[in-house]
Regions:
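Alpha-helical transmembrane segments of integral membrane proteins, especially early/N-terminal helices
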Residues: 51-71, 98-108, 143-148, 196, ...
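Alpha-helical transmembrane segments of multi-pass integral membrane proteins
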Residues: 126-209
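Hydrophobic alpha-helical membrane-insertion segments
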Residues: 23-57, 132-150
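Selective recognition of hydrophobic, aromatic-rich stretches within alpha-helical transmembrane segments
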Residues: 93-110, 174-186
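Individual transmembrane alpha-helix segments
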Residues: 73-104
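Cytoplasmic juxtamembrane interface segments
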Residues: 2-39, 107-135
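Transmembrane helix-loop junctions in multipass membrane proteins, especially transporters and channels
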Residues: 40-51, 119-121, 154-162, 208
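Long, glycine/tryptophan/cysteine-rich extracytoplasmic
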Residues: 44-85, 166-172
């Protein structure tokens, strides 16, 4: 049975680097999973939820030295801790955290799988493409789902804690989305598409020879 080997340009340093990345990805994945389990168990057992909210609270300019030219200041975010929230709100917070955890696990495990296939001498197997596609989809869709869940949970939690806004300006019902994971997913999908097209072109060319 023929054994596939890396190209001649793959050095020992490359192999060491791939080993480090592969093992590192597995360690990170394990840490992420354990962290999620510990956090979830803590939230369920204590009933206490920690979450950030946007604020628009004025800060007395004198606290920062008004004589130096500062005329106004505001807090833009606050970290809240609350107990006694309804089961639905707690479950929604946990679901949002679960989605973020799942995205991180898919990406890190895909990276570890790619490294493992390379170390086995078969980095271009179709399963590697599939794992990359899974990571790209997770990066593009996961953050949107997590944002929807966390925003819903935060809004419901604020309503339970403070009631309707009724003209207050200290708590803001808003959300912030980071486009970096989505763009990373798009970039990964493009790279995988180009790679797949190149593989098919190579196969077609070899078939003509």
């Amino acid at each position: 049975m023929a054994v596939k080997k890396e190209p001649a340009w793959v050095t020992m340093g490359d192999r060491v680097s791939i080993w480090v990345v592969t093992i590192g990805a597995l360690i990170v994945a394990a840490f992420i999973l354990v962290s999620f389990v510990v956090t979830t168990v803590g939230q369920v057992s204590s009933g206490e939820i920690h979450f950030p909210v946007f604020t628009d609270t004025a800060v007395p300019a004198g606290e920062f030295g008004q004589d130096r030219g500062l005329t106004a200041a505001t807090y833009t975010e606050a970290s809240l801790s609350a107990t006694g929230l309804s089961t639905g709100v707690v479950a929604t917070f946990i679901a949002a955290n679960a989605v973020n955890t799942l995205v991180a696990l898919i990406v890190t495990l895909a990276l570890a799988f790619m490294g493992w296939r390379w170390l086995k001498g078969d980095p271009f197997r179709q399963s590697v493409i599939y794992s990359g596609i899974a990571a790209a989809i997770a990066l593009m869709l996961g953050p949107f789902a997590a944002l929807l869940l966390s925003t819903t949970a935060t809004t419901r939690a604020l309503l339970e804690i403070a009631g309707p806004k009724e003209g207050r300006s200290d708590l803001i019902f808003a959300a912030e989305f980071n486009l970096a994971p989505f763009l990373a997913g798009v970039g990964l999908a493009i790279v995988l598409g180009i790679f797949e097209a190149g593989q098919k072109l190579k196969a077609d060319t070899e078939g003509l020879v």
